[in-house]
A protein has these predicted regions:
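Methionine residue identity
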Residues: 1, 7, 36-39
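Nucleotidyltransferase catalytic core that binds NTPs
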Residues: 38-226, 231, 235-327, 336, ...
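A conserved acidic, glycine/proline-rich C-terminal tail/linker
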Residues: 330-348, 356
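Short, basic/aromatic-enriched C-terminal tail that caps enzymatic domains
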Residues: 342-344, 354-374
Length: 374
């Protein structure tokens, strides 16, 4: 619990240690912010709806020697999200930014987008009650995808051709777009994602690699086009000047510029029966939640039996176990290499293996995964 809750939309430039004082002044003249303050009382969350506000806050924190840990979400927060925020808060010398943005470009089914649970008041209450997030970024769609700027596009090769990528065409292209845009807006030092969406984690890891390569390419092009380019054509007159510019970043207002954060994975959080926590669980009945616990119970069979069965036998037994659960419709059960997601045909060909599942129940699609070995 650090300061009052302030609604900053838009926010004035916040400088140095005056950020909280200026924010307090700002909220006093915002009727909407005042109502929100009365609703939620004291907490430590600054709320921003535009890039100028969050970027001003981040610059202020950086001037004070803090780094930024970023937890992007689509809202409908649960204990798994809060655990990521808590892990972020325990990183050294950080300020924690959580975002809520339901990204339309990663939904291949419009009905799924419409049905996605949204409860911003509850989300804010959870963050406020926890008291570990320093800022909540809730951008509008035009802030994330400005009409005047085309979106960057990404290809993730084999990572997007299996499981979620195969079943949800265009899903990971949308994930790449939104993560790239949010990282451009937030400029974080750390990016925290959950283990439950493990395939997404690998996709984002590859996205960061591509952004790093893109930034190096842009830096080289900038040097090549410099009017001060020397005989070497690299944009520098001499070795001393070249050395000074070796780590020179591009201007942060360029659409394609990104700070490349350190990627951190948080462990999957489960209820007392093993069901992986998910925003989609809110759409299940109590009976549906009880049945859904059988997903993780079945996946654990692979960890217990992999030394005694072939990969194909393991998958078939899990399918039989889930077929006995009423109202289940299994979309896939897949054994995959933990690093490449290549299908596992023989245990000995892989140093680390996970098993993945996608199952429908009560019209809700649930995914889960767990380590088989090591």
């Amino acid at each position: 619990m650090r300061v009052f809750l302030f609604m900053l939309d838009p926010v004035q430039k916040l400088k140095g240690k005056n950020i909280k004082k200026q924010a307090k002044k700002e909220q006093k003249i915002k009727g909407k912010a005042w109502k929100m303050w009365k609703m939620y009382g004291f907490c430590g969350v600054l709320i921003f709806h535009n890039a100028d506000g969050i970027q001003s806050a981040i610059k202020s924190w950086q001037m004070e020697g803090f780094k930024v840990a970023f937890v992007p979400t689509m809202g409908a927060l649960h204990e798994g999200h809060l655990a990521l925020v808590e892990r972020a808060a325990h990183l050294p010398q950080v300020r924690v930014v959580c975002s809520i943005f339901v990204n339309p470009t990663q939904f291949n089914d419009p009905a799924d987008l419409r049905a996605y649970p949204r409860n911003p008041a509850r989300d804010l209450h959870l963050l406020s009650e926890q008291g570990l997030a320093d800022a909540l970024f809730q951008p509008e769609i035009d802030e994330v995808y400005p009409p005047e700027h085309p979106c960057m596009t990404f290809s993730f090769g084999a990572l997007e051709e299996v499981m979620e990528g195969a079943m949800r065409p265009g899903h990971f292209a949308g994930v790449g777009q939104v993560v790239a845009r949010l990282l451009h807006l937030v400029q974080a030092d750390y990016l925290l994602l959950g283990e439950k969406d493990y395939q997404q984690f690998l996709v984002v890891r590859d996205l960061l690699r591509q952004l790093q390569e893109n930034q190096l390419r842009l830096r080289d092009e900038k040097r090549q086009s410099s009017p001060f380019s020397g005989p070497s054509g690299d944009g520098f007159y001499n070795p001393e000047e070249r050395a000074r510019g070796a780590d020179e970043p591009l201007e942060p207002d360029e659409l394609t510029w990104h700070k490349i954060p350190e990627l951190i994975m948080g462990t999957t959080h489960r209820d007392e029966g093993g069901l992986a926590l998910s925003s989609r669980n809110q759409r299940l009945s109590n009976e549906g939640r009880l049945k859904a616990r059988q997903i993780y119970a079945a996946l654990q069979h692979a960890r217990r039996r992999w030394t005694l069965e072939s990969p194909d036998e393991t998958v078939q037994k899990i399918l039989l176990m889930l077929a006995e659960v009423p109202d289940f419709r299994v979309e896939y059960i897949q054994l995959a290499d933990s690093d490449t997601l290549a299908a596992v045909r023989e245990w000995g060909n892989h140093s680390s293996v996970r098993i993945f599942a996608a199952v429908w129940i009560e019209g809700v699609r649930l995914i889960d995964n767990t380590v088989v070995f090591p």
